[in-house]
Amino acid sequence: MRDVWYSSSYLLDRKQSMNGCAKARFENYKMQPVEFAFMPEFKGKLSQYGITPDRRTPSGIRAAIIREKGTNGEREMAYSLYLAGFDVKDVTMTDLISGRETLEDVNMIVYCGGFSNSDVLGSAKGWAGAFLFNPKAKEALDKFYAREDTLSLGVCNGCQLMMELNLINPELKKKGKMLHNNSHKFESRFLGLTIPTNRSVMFGSLSGSKLGIWVAHGEGKFSLPYDEDKYNVVAKYSYDEYPGNPNGSDYSIAALASADGRHLAIMPHLERSIFPWQNGCYPADRKNSDQVTPWIEAFVNARKWVEAKMKSVSYTHLRAHETCADL
């Protein structure tokens, strides 16, 4: 019955989707269920992470959302960071270009999703140019990444920006690229992600999980010049075939992290999936009891990492002061 209902859509899709994707979608739509596998310690409660939506006092842990003309995912991202315990500031490219903002007082920056500069010349090309060809913005970015107490996250358009600026794998001679989806269509759907064992600040504790997440992009294909083992892969689409792999990414990669695990670029929108009610589907035995999904843990991990760094720096300064006093 469902095949009969779907057949008209398939006939229309054949005239729109490229590279045989319409046929693959029709053949696989009922073969790729979104699977969930949570870590045993996940309870689904805010109290598990010591967080509350009612917080009204600053935590002192600062994150900045960086946005450009056409960014449209900053509200969900700001709330995800706030709920996890960050104090969040809004930074526009104009702030960086003019020198009003230097990023010196923040430990985490996030590039949000959207369509910066309407994707003219390609996704994130103009946004990258705003950093590369404006001295004050470039200086702020370079100084931020030169520090050892910083994290960064790029989602969707922000992921494309990080790849364009070569912020994830600067140690490799050849730079990876983000290309148009194989279907040559904008892909928007709720699908499954698998988190492999990985060494990253945000996703390390989620290793072994299978989670649902939203994708919404037209140029989300990771095209990578080296073998998979050269990269710190932190998330994969749960299926290699379209539409489970919505863009044809090499090795079914959905997210990459830097070699040290501090900087993460991901195409799907984890900030749009932190609550069960945001998910297109969720385990029936948990959807009425869980307050949050495991995706919130990624943001909490980031906040805890920064907290630990700040305490370490404070302790080092204290010991240095005591040593000077003893002399």
Indicate residue ranges for each PLM-predicted region.
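Short acidic loop-to-helix transition motifs that present clustered carboxylates
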Residues: 91-99
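Glycine-rich phosphate/diphosphate-binding loop of Rossmann-like nucleotide-binding domains
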Residues: 67-68, 72-74
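Cysteine-nucleophile active-site neighborhood
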Residues: 112-200, 285
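Intein/HINT protein-splicing elements and their conserved insertion hotspots or analogous self-processing inserts
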Residues: 1-62, 70
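Short helix-loop-beta junction
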Residues: 75-90
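Amide-donor transfer/coupling interface in amidating biosynthetic enzymes
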Residues: 99-101, 142-145, 175-314
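Conserved small/polar residues in nucleotide/adenosyl-binding loops
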Residues: 316-323
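Short acidic/histidine-rich motifs immediately flanking catalytic phosphotransfer sites
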Residues: 104-109
